UniProtKB/Swiss-Prot annotation:
Keywords: Cytokine, Cytoplasm, Inflammatory response, Lysosome, Mitogen, Pyrogen, Secreted. It is found in: Cytoplasm, Cytosol; Secreted; Lysosome; Secreted, Extracellular exosome. IL1B production occurs in 2 steps, each being controlled by different stimuli. First, inflammatory signals, such as LPS, stimulate the synthesis and promote the accumulation of cytosolic stores of pro-IL1B (priming). Then additional signals are required for inflammasome assembly, leading to CASP1 activation, pro-IL1B processing and eventually secretion of the active cytokine. IL1B processing and secretion are temporarily associated. This is Interleukin-1 beta. It holds the Pfam family IL1_propep. The gene is IL1B. It comes from Macaca mulatta (Rhesus macaque). Monomer. In its precursor form, weakly interacts with full-length MEFV; the mature cytokine does not interact at all. Interacts with integrins ITGAV:ITGBV and ITGA5:ITGB1; integrin-binding is required for IL1B signaling. Interacts with cargo receptor TMED10; the interaction is direct and is required for the secretion of IL1B mature form. Interacts with HSP90AB1; the interaction facilitates cargo translocation into the ERGIC. Interacts with HSP90B1; the interaction facilitates cargo translocation into the ERGIC.
Length: 269
């Protein structure tokens, strides 16, 4: 912040010298014969009067603002002359001194802002349109099969996180992690074909608001059914086979032999 200089000697020459009422006359060294206590407005035709209170003499910023405003900003208008310069008076003068300008923050490359944002998550299970549940088959594979009774405890509980992505009215970007495991569903290219896999991650860094694109799925709701489209590979969906006990995979067709419709059941934390 720039320093406000002390009152110049030329200005001090216009100082009245009265201990009780100190005035400045903008037009010259003529002491004004009026009191701030008797006037609500100081007309500029009679000169601009400034009262400096000894009680607030050490508050240099207030004093400087009074002088600057009177000499530079209030020359063309009528201004109230309060008995004592108060905090609320300063707040009303600030807009006349400083010009307000909008500040635009470019966050396109500011990943730190996104990383620090809280991630909203929920726990759920998924079943396909044939009511097959998803279960673990080996350390890095999911299969779909029918479960009943106590076997339902085998189904995978997902931690669905709402992440950054191309959100629209019908698409919500999410990441699908496995509850209590450091595994996330991700989409990668293998043998020139989009492929679904379970990928191990560092729990210190995941989940996060800005997930890598291979982890992001667009959750689409149609007729109370859900589809999960890969953000990395548009028009490719989490799919199951018509057959029992087959791996969950990434399919490129909808409404055909492969099942892309799921129902979601919420699970309490």
């Amino acid at each position: 912040m720039a320093e406000v200089p002390e009152l110049a000697s030329e200005m001090m020459a216009y100082y009245s010298g009265n201990e009780d009422d100190l005035f400045f006359d903008v037009d010259g060294p003529k002491q004004m014969k009026c009191s701030f206590q008797d006037l609500d407005l100081c007309p500029l035709g009679g000169g601009i009067q400034l009262q400096i209170s000894h009680e607030h003499y050490n508050e240099g910023f207030r004093q400087a603002v009074s002088v600057v405003v009177a000499m530079e900003k209030l020359r063309k208008m009528l201004v109230p002359c309060p008995q004592i310069f108060q905090d609320n008076d300063l707040s009303t003068l600030i807009p006349f001194i400083f010009e307000e300008e909008p500040v635009f923050l470019d966050t396109r490359n500011n990943d730190a802002c996104v990383h620090d944002a809280p991630v909203r998550s929920l726990h759920c299970t998924l079943r396909d349109a044939q009511l097959k549940s998803l279960v673990m088959s080996g350390p890095y594979e999911l299969k779909a099969l029918h479960l009943q009774g106590q076997d339902l405890e085998q189904q995978v509980v997902f931690s669905m996180s709402f992440v950054q992505g191309e959100e629209s009215n019908d698409k919500i970007p999410v990441a699908l992690g496995l509850k209590a495991k450091n595994l996330y569903l991700s989409c990668v290219l293998k043998d020139d074909k989009p492929t679904l896999q379970l990928e191990s991650v560092d729990p210190k860094n995941y989940p996060k608001k800005k997930m890598e694109k291979r982890f992001v799925f667009n959750k689409i709701e149609i007729n109370n059914k859900l589809e999960f489209e890969s953000a990395q590979f548009p028009n490719w969906y989490i799919s199951t086979s018509q057959a029992e006990n087959m791996p969950v995979f990434l399919g490129g067709t909808r409404g055909g032999q492969d099942i892309t419709d799921f129902t979601m059941q919420f699970v309490s934390s």
